[in-house]
Amino acid sequence: MAEITAKLVKELREKSGAGVMDAKKALVETDGDMDKAIELLREKGMAKAAKKADRVAAEGLTGVYVSGNYAAVVEVNAETDFVAKNAQFVELVNDTAKTIAEGKPANNEEALNLIMPSGETLAAAYVNATATIGEKISFRRFSLLEKTDEQHFGAYQHNGGRIGVISVIEGGDDALAKQVSMHIAAMKPTVLSYTELDPQFVKDELAKLNHNIELDNESRAMVDKAPLPFLQYGSKAQLSEDVIAKAEEDIKAELAAEGKPEKIWDKIIPGKMDRFMLDNTKVDQAYTLLAQVYIMDDSKTVEAYLDSVNAKAIAFARFEVGEGIEKKANDFESEVAATMAAALNN
């Protein structure tokens, strides 16, 4: 039987990423054959990964990477926040973003077949990471953005990498693009423009807003405050030419009833129309980047600010770790109970 030296164990660990005991056991089982030991660890790693496949991984990090005129933002998940801070995990996330930006896959299936800097496929890298780290590690999603030579990327990560953003702007510079990405990280828009919102979604969100107004009015009534008006519309998409024309006529009728001289109406109407637009595009303001008040200049929307500096938002992608993942509150408790039960039965 071959002698299993510390040097041999170290070499196997460096090649496989396995722990000391796992590496030593693999060498013992394969009589010191390095290639067979690596293959054995790979098979055991796949088995470990398979056992962890149905676990919920809702922690993790985002990664962003710019490669020429392409940029990628990715989300990689782990089961615990502790592992998400692990150096091996962070390297995996960064390598994944780089691989996506340079490989330009069309979907997750293509992405999983790309070759990582380590020389293995992305899919294999995650199997091995799950085996060596000891938690389910999963590649969840990516977004790949492209720009022209004249456009600019804004790459930004917030909260230790839990939020990752890439934006594309035309005009301006990289610094402005990064500021736009910082706004996106903070304000959570889901689309660029109101034209991308689903009509039924707008109706549903408008109903929620009016329900909140109804609840607020109940509280206001208790302290003899005047009720707030309900919203008629929620998006610019609902404001047809007829709707806007009627709003202007209503304002004129209001001014006439107040006895305001017609000669000053032209000075009053634009401000009231701006207010009408603001009050009736609340859904746009919540979900569309261009309609949101710009955090760097709260006197303007993002669209108005960019227009004032001869720039334009083209596209963006924003990922926040765990969004949309339903994590059971008793995952940890269940795992501990199962471990104790197994120990008692052995």
Curated annotation (Swiss-Prot):
Example of a GO MF term: translation elongation factor activity
Full protein name: Elongation factor Ts
Matches recorded under PROSITE patterns: EF_TS_1, EF_TS_2
NCBIfam families referenced in this protein's UniProt entry, alphabetically: tsf
Entries under HAMAP family matching the protein: EF_Ts
Keyword terms, alphabetized: Cytoplasm, Elongation factor, Protein biosynthesis
Gene3D superfamilies: 1.10.286.20, DNA helicase RuvA subunit, C-terminal domain (1.10.8.10), Elongation factor Ts, dimerisation domain (3.30.479.20)
Function statement: Associates with the EF-Tu.GDP complex and induces the exchange of GDP to GTP. It remains bound to the aminoacyl-tRNA.EF-Tu.GTP complex up to the GTP hydrolysis stage on the ribosome.
A cellular-component GO term for this protein: cytoplasm
